[in-house]
Amino acid sequence: MRIRYGWELALAALLVIEIVAFGAINPRMLDLNMLLFSTSDFICIGIVALPLTMVIVSGGIDISFGSTIGLCAIALGVLFQSGVPMPLAILLTLLLGALCGLINAGLIIYTKVNPLVITLGTLYLFAGSALLLSGMAGATGYEGIGGFPMAFTDFANLDVLGLPVPLIIFLICLLVFWLWLHKTHAGRNVFLIGQSPRVAVYSAIPVNRTLCALYAMTGLASAVAAVLLVSYFGSARSDLGASFLMPAITAVVLGGANIYGGSGSIIGTAIAVLLVGYLQQGLQMAGVPNQVSSALSGALLIVVVVGRSVSLHRQQIKEWLARRANNPLP
């Protein structure tokens, strides 16, 4: 195994230590079935975090995916409520997710405005659209739209060969996005765009087309997450993705992505998703209040960002310390 997987190995070791530590507090944490099936509570965050990694590698950001999930979820409910067959409703929901991503990409490309500002705007646009649809359908905030076929609501709660379906879909997404980013020419273009967009343009790399693909994949993954969440909870609500933003970005940064673009790892993000997810699960099983666990997740994000920054600039830090040692302050 090449040395470039060192960060991923460190994350994997940290994941094992985390599980063992929580297992010492609550032995249920060491039960394999509990570990596998508890992923259904957070693995949709990972499905979105994987393409989000590629967006961040390209030097962009998308903070609207939580609202995209809510919009796609309520759209699925409205379509079903209107009599659209379930397979067609799911297909249209997936197309809606991809369209949301393309809207983000189009606005970023043609306005030249910072992606953070654009996706902050579309976050409110998609969230407002979801609330509008929900109100038109007569759905309440907590109950949402229900009455889905049992075959659909059972889907996200099934298991195949002992693995829950949401985890299997996450693993399929992991394989697809890893192959695309790390093993294709288009994936290498993403790294080049993140390192220097101007050089990428002069190198005849299709920057705009690549960005459209990245944001569309994030929107599509958001729609997949929405379908799984509606199936899992049996209800389509506009707030289903509202809490996904911080854990997803934490997983991407913890997984090794440079927030300024140019580097990142799909496998690292996948391991980090499990790390963050099991952290929340372990804290809950240890009886820690949700407010405290959320604060710890925020602290983890800060520590990771600072740690990665120190790691990226360690040579400059060493030189600065050497200068201070040679020229101490009077």
UniProtKB/Swiss-Prot annotation:
It is a multi-pass membrane protein. It comes from the Bacteria. Residues 26-42, 137-159, 231-237, 280-285 are periplasmic. Residues 1-4, 64-67, 110-115, 181-209, 307-330 are cytoplasmic. Signal peptide: none annotated. Its main location: membrane. Part of the ABC transporter complex LsrABCD involved in autoinducer 2 (AI-2) import. Probably responsible for the translocation of the substrate across the membrane. The complex is composed of two ATP-binding proteins (LsrA), two transmembrane proteins (LsrC and LsrD) and a solute-binding protein (LsrB). This is Autoinducer 2 import system permease protein LsrD. It comes from Escherichia coli (strain SMS-3-5 / SECEC). The lineage of its organism: Bacteria, Pseudomonadati, Pseudomonadota, Gammaproteobacteria, Enterobacterales.
